[in-house]
Each structure stands twice: as C-alpha cells, then as structure tokens.
Curated annotation (Swiss-Prot):
It is found in: Nucleus. This is Transcriptional regulator claA. It holds the Pfam family Zn_clus. Residues 25-52 bind DNA. Keywords: DNA-binding, Metal-binding, Nucleus, Transcription, Transcription regulation, Zinc.
C-alpha cells in the first residue's frame, strides 16, 4: 500500500532559505479577516482586483547559526566575564566601520564585526578629538605664524603715525624703517628668512632708487626732473607703471578701482574667512617698500612734480586692489594690521601732495607744514588769466613737462586746468578709499591698538582731504 504524503494546510513557500513569509496576505491582515491563503492571489484580493502581497516575518532576536561561516561555528561558545563588553564594543565597531555596510546578510555583518573587533583588540589606537575652541583656533591661525612675529620693525611706523597728528611730515618720514630692516618681519625667527620669499627684483628695489631719470623727458609726456632719484618704472611714457618690487606678484586686474566700487561686497571676500595658504602676494614687504620710497622723497625734496605724484598714486592703487584680494592678509587676526599699513601709505601719499602745493616749478620750493595750504596764489591767478601770470609759485602740484595732444604742444593755461582736474580726481578717489577702509575696519572684531590707531588715522585723513578739496574750490 502506497503511503501518500499528507498535504500541508500552509501554502508552499518558494522563498530563499532564511526568510519566512506570513500565511495571510497584507490586505487580509490589515482588515483582520480570514485569508484563503491562495498563491499568488487570494480570493478576496482577486474579487476586489487588488494586488496580493505576502510580506516576510520581521526577524527578532539573534540570527540563526545556519548562515554563519565554518570558522565561526568551530569557536567555543562559552561565556566569559567580558562577554558583555565584547558585544557592546562589537556593536559600536559595526556602526562605525564603513566597510561593513556592504554586507547583505546578518551573518556576514557579524563575521565582519568580529574581524574588526579582533583588530581593535590587537592594536588599540586612541582617536584624537578636538573641541570647538581648538578647531576655531587652528582655523584662524595663519600658516606663517602671526602670533610669534617680531614686530619691532613696525614700531617706528606706529610711533610715526601717532606723531604725525601734531607734527610736520619730515618727522613721520624719519620714523619709517629702511628696506634693510624688512628681515625683522620674519614670521618664524630663527627658522626661516623672509628674503627667501622675496624675488630678486623686490630686493633690488632700493638699488633702483639710485637710478636717476634723464634730465629731460621725451616730447608727448610729462618730464621728470633729474633731481629726484626715481626709477624708470615711474614714467608716464611707454615704460611699466609699477616699480620692480611689484613684479613679484600678479596684479588682480579683474578688480575694479577703489573709486568705482568702494563697497567691498563686490570683491567677494570675507574678513572672517580662514586663510587658504601662505601669502603669495608679499603684501607686507610691498607696503614697506612703498613707505621707504615715500621716505626718500620726503627726505630729498620738499615737493614733487605732479607726474611723479600721479605715478606714485597709480602704484599705490594697484597695491591697494591686490591686497584687498589677498585672503591671507585680510583674515580676521591680520586684517587690523593690514588696514593700518594701507592707511599709513595713503596718508603719506596725501602728505606728498600737500607738500608739493606752493612749491617752485613743481618740486624745488619751500616746504609747507601739513594742512597749511597756501591760498595766496588765488590773488596771483585771479581773473582766470593764467597765461600771463608768474609761475614761480604754484597753488597745486605742478610739472614743467610739456603737455602734448598728438604733435601739438598745449599752452600753460590748458596744462594748469588739466593739473587741477587730476588733483581733484585724486582727492575724490581718496574720499572713496577712506569710506571703503572704514567699512572694512568696522567688520574687524576686537578693540586692539591697531584698530584704534587706524580709526584715528582715517579721521585725520578725512579731515585733510576735505580741507584740500575746499582749498581747490576756493582757488578756482
């Protein structure tokens, strides 16, 4: 007699091993009614036209040992006193290990967890954690170490800035350090030398001052007097505008001028951003070189021709735009000192313009105290008849060079009008620069000495600029 196998009441389950499905479909389980348990569609889902889905059971508890590898089955299963700590560490490692996420089964995850656990037990390396304050300090710290900088070479600049408020310009000039003192700005004393980051052209800028310009300029441009040991890079002709010291870094020509865009949001930088790298523009050495050049002019002469002043102003504007695009020198911990140096350069340039007012033939007359502009020439040039007047004393910076339009030499009347217009444009541009620097200084956090000195210098510069503009208006 043949024995037939008993038919099971449960539906046949063709699922892969390790998965067990519900006997009733999801629709019947949700409605809490009896399911016909027919596959692939039960009677109720077939009648209502719904999709019949049988969901697997949710695994509860520890996984089955049938899916574990052979080497795991051979390990002893005895419990130890450290079993609880082992399981706790295993769970932490399984969550923190990135390679375990690729495992598809619980057994593989357990096997990978045990391997990571053995590696953690053999070599235990403590993880280094940083607090928020330490991270902030590490981000805001410059690579070249401003904290350990020896600022002894800048003490003369700071003292000179404070002493210029009641004193004359030559006292400020005497306090500016020489170019050979730039090595005192070494950010890491005893380890590195700043001359390693300076190009040979930057180091030879002082020798370029000894190169005298030809006594008479070519026709078609303002002439430079041979009395001033000025480099050929300052000419208004076809030569380069910037001196050799500025060739050490690229000029950011994409930035607009300070007069056209006094608002700093258009430049796209943030004073509180972290430095990206070491300063590649050599902003501080370039500013020191410019101050040294101004010191030479103030020491050798009481006034400069207008063409020299305008070229010097163009050089300062190029450096100003480049420094405002430097992410290292305008970081929060260095912005105050950078803005103070820029303001000192602008004030020294304004002093050169003031000293050139009332000079004889553009640079060889008597010197004037700062802020004491000579208004007597208004009487000499009254009535607008400039051509027949005596040019022995000039109310504004002036040059003896010829002003040409093509091949035509313009007379002194037209040249005087152009000179006054150029000086007025310089003053209006400087008013925009003062406003821009004031906005940048307002974003710097803290109340250090550099911020207070810069605020005083900006107020003094604004007062002198307004006085200069009023003087030009009165002499028109």
């Amino acid at each position: 007699m043949l024995l037939q196998p008993e038919s099971s009441s449960k539906p046949r389950n063709d699922s892969p091993p390790g998965f067990k499905f519900h006997s009733s479909c999801d629709t019947c389980l949700k409605a809490k009614i009896k399911c016909s348990q027919a596959k692939p569609t039960c009677a109720r889902c077939l009648q209502q036209g719904r999709q019949c889905v049988y969901s697997p059971y949710r695994k509860i508890g520890r996984p089955s040992t049938k899916n574990l590898p052979l080497d795991q089955l051979q390990q002893p299963k005895g419990r130890t006193a450290g079993g609880t700590a082992r399981r706790s560490l295993s769970r932490r490692v399984s969550l923190a290990s990135p390679g375990i996420e690729n495992g598809s089964r619980v057994g593989n995850v357990r096997h990978a967890t045990n391997r990571v656990l053995h590696a953690q037990e053999s070599v235990l390396v403590p993880s280094q954690t940083w607090s928020d304050q330490e991270l902030t300090g590490n981000i805001n710290r410059l690579d070249y170490g401003l904290e350990g900088t020896n600022w002894s070479a800048l003490e003369g600049l700071l003292d000179a800035s404070m002493s210029t408020l009641p004193q004359a310009d030559h006292e400020l000039a005497s306090a500016v350090p020489r170019l050979d003192q730039v090595h005192d700005l070494d950010p890491n004393p005893g380890q590195e030398d700043l001359t390693g980051y300076l190009s040979p052209s930057s180091l030879s800028s002082r020798e370029s001052l000894a190169t005298t310009f030809p006594p008479e300029a070519e026709a078609g441009s303002f002439g430079l007097s041979s009395e001033f040991p000025f480099s050929a890079g300052y000419s208004l002709g076809t030569g380069p505008v910037l001196s050799e010291s500025l060739n050490a870094f690229p000029v950011l020509s994409s930035f607009p001028s300070s007069a056209s865009s006094p608002v700093t949001e258009a430049r796209g930088f943030n004073l509180l951003s972290a430095p990206t790298d070491r300063c590649t523009f050599q902003c501080y050495p370039v500013l020191i070189n410019i101050l040294n050049d101004m010191n030479e002019f103030q020491r050798k002469s009481s006034g400069l021709p207008l063409d020299v002043l305008l070229n010097l102003d163009k050089r300062v504007r190029k450096v100003h735009e480049t420094i405002l695009g430097c992410p290292c020198c305008l970081v929060s911990c260095a912005a105050a000192l950078t803005l103070m140096l820029i303001t000192m350069v602008n004030i020294n340039l304004l002093s050169l313009f003031e000293r050139s007012c009332g000079s004889t033939d553009g640079g060889s007359g008597s010197s004037m105290s700062r802020g004491e502009l000579n208004v007597a020439p208004r009487i000499a040039f009254g009535g607008g008849n400039y051509a027949g007047q005596d040019r022995s004393r000039n109310p504004l910076p002036y040059t003896t060079g010829h002003l040409t339009l093509g091949n035509i030499h313009l007379d002194e009347t037209v040249k005087l009008v152009f000179s006054r217009r150029l000086v007025r444009l310089y003053l209006e541009r400087q008013l925009g620069v003062v406003q821009q620097l004031s906005q940048l200084l307002g974003r710097v956090e803290g109340d250090g000495a550099s911020i207070k000195v810069t605020q005083d210098l900006l107020r003094d510069q604004l007062r002198r600029l307004e006085h200069f503009v009023g003087f030009i208006t009165l002499t028109d």
